[in-house]
Amino acid sequence: MDTLLEHEAADLYDEQQIDRIGDAVTGDAGDDSDDTLEDGQQLLGVNRQMDILLDAPQEPPMAVFPARGGPNGGPPRLRKKRSFYTMVKPTPPCQSREPEMCRLMASVTRAMRQVREDQRGEYFANYLVENMTSQNYPNGVGLPQHWGQF
């Protein structure tokens, strides 16, 4: 263990002596500011290269691999994978924009358009009582059987 410490101490002394000799040769008298500046610039260069690598995209651009179909030729790639549930699907033109409803509700809404807004609630109830009869809808045909069914 002592030999290891002596060896390290000798290396440190040799490095200091070499540094002093280098200072004497260059004439800067122990001022190592130029060396630290170069080391700092070199360190900044390494960090900048690392920053560039970290900011780079995870896969190479498609122009590097023209056989896969980059911008030069082939089908364009999708920019982003999308969920099946969030994609917009075109609706067929035969479907109307109005919500689906039974005949009774359709005739109620049609009739309510002719009534003033402050009387619509009362008119709605009276219309249902008058028109939701077995005479108008025999055996309940045309009426919803349960909530949510049209």
Curated annotation (Swiss-Prot):
<keyword id="KW-0221">Differentiation</keyword>
<comment type="similarity">
    <text>Belongs to the male-specific scotti family.</text>
</comment>
<keyword id="KW-0744">Spermatogenesis</keyword>
<feature type="region of interest" description="Disordered">
    <location>
        <begin position="60"/>
        <end position="84"/>
    </location>
</feature>
<comment type="function">
    <text>Post-meiotically transcribed gene that has a role in late spermiogenesis; required for actin cone progression during spermatid individualization.</text>
</comment>
<protein>
    <recommendedName>
        <fullName>Male-specific protein scotti</fullName>
    </recommendedName>
</protein>
<dbReference type="Pfam" id="PF17079">
    <property type="entry name" value="SOTI"/>
</dbReference>
<dbReference type="InterPro" id="IPR031397">
    <property type="entry name" value="Soti"/>
</dbReference>
<dbReference type="GO" id="GO:0007291">
    <property type="term" value="P:sperm individualization"/>
</dbReference>
<keyword id="KW-0217">Developmental protein</keyword>
<feature type="glycosylation site" description="N-linked (GlcNAc...) asparagine">
    <location>
        <position position="131"/>
    </location>
</feature>
<keyword id="KW-0325">Glycoprotein</keyword>
